[in-house]
A protein has these predicted regions:
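Short, hydrophobic secondary-structure boundary micro-motifs
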Residues: 93-99, 121-124, 166-171, 196, ...
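Generic structural signal for helix capping and beta-alpha/helix-loop junctions
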Residues: 49, 222-223
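GST-like fold's C-terminal all-alpha helical module
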Residues: 114-207
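Active-site-flanking alpha-helical
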Residues: 86, 183-184, 215
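Short, solvent-exposed turn/loop segments enriched in Gly/Ser/Thr/Pro and often Arg
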Residues: 45, 175, 218-219
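GST-like domain detector, emphasizing the conserved glutathione-binding G-site
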Residues: 2-141
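Residue-level recognition of oxygen-bearing side chains
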Residues: 80, 197, 210
């Protein structure tokens, strides 16, 4: 099979990442740090009016974070941002999404699984009726069902990690690890129990220097040093 042509990554100009403090915004920060890219941070927070300003709405009518500006390109959705950054700036040693067709398909399969089954269908339901119950109302049965569903979906992760890979796709860190780890951390914060192998995996992934830098960049303004 012919291998995809290796292209030189675009150098790019000014990069601005809007959004801090959430499990979704940290994904974009993490990818930027893993790729060694410089960028400016706009410490916009969710649900405090920051995303409803005329300035931000002009960038995205969705009024959601994270949002990446890369020169004249504006892109939202954390998984799309991570994939774009890898495709545009990734080098052989730090690319987050493989170039080969099968490797890319497997990575994106994991990414789409995490975003749809773990994030949107499970964890965000818990958030809506937990942290945001003053908006969406309390729904204990929905929260319980979401917790059970999350744990059920995590079985495929447990089986994969049962073969003792360092990362979810083996020995290489990818975008799938960024998305999966942020969901595991999110679940643990909600006191959702997960397998020991999952906890150990998450410790390995979050021990990366790029994660520590992302945590600092993702901190809300009041939590920043000197802030």
């Amino acid at each position: 099979m012919t291998q995809p042509e290796e292209k030189m990554p675009r150098q790019g100009g000014e990069r601005i990442l809007w959004g801090v403090s959430t499990s979704r915004t940290i994904r974009a920060h993490w990818a930027l740090h893993e790729l060694g890219l410089s960028y400016q941070v706009r410490p916009v927070l969710p649900r405090n009016g920051d995303t409803h300003t005329a300035e931000f709405t002009a960038l995205s009518a969705r009024q959601k974070i994270p949002l990446l500006q890369d020169d004249d390109l504006i892109i939202t959705e954390s998984a799309a941002i991570v994939s774009y950054l890898s495709d545009t700036y990734g080098l052989p040693h730090n690319r987050l999404v493989p170039l080969d067709v099968r490797g890319r398909a497997r990575c994106l399969e994991w990414c789409f699984f995490v975003i749809s089954e773990l994030d949107a269908t499970s964890l965000y339901v818990m958030r809506r009726h937990g942290d945001l119950r003053h908006i969406y109302g309390e729904a204990p049965r929905a929260n319980e069902a979401a917790t059970v569903y999350f744990q059920k979906q995590m079985r495929s992760v447990e089986r994969t990690l049962g073969d003792a890979p360092h990362y979810i796709m083996g020995d290489r860190f990818t975008a799938a690890d960024i998305l999966l780890s942020t969901c595991i951390t999110w679940a643990l914060r909600y006191n959702v129990s997960v397998a020991d192998s999952v906890v150990a995996y998450n410790r390995r992934v979050t021990a990366r220097p790029g994660y520590a830098r992302a945590v600092a960049s993702n901190a809300p303004p009041a939590a920043r040093v000197g802030g």
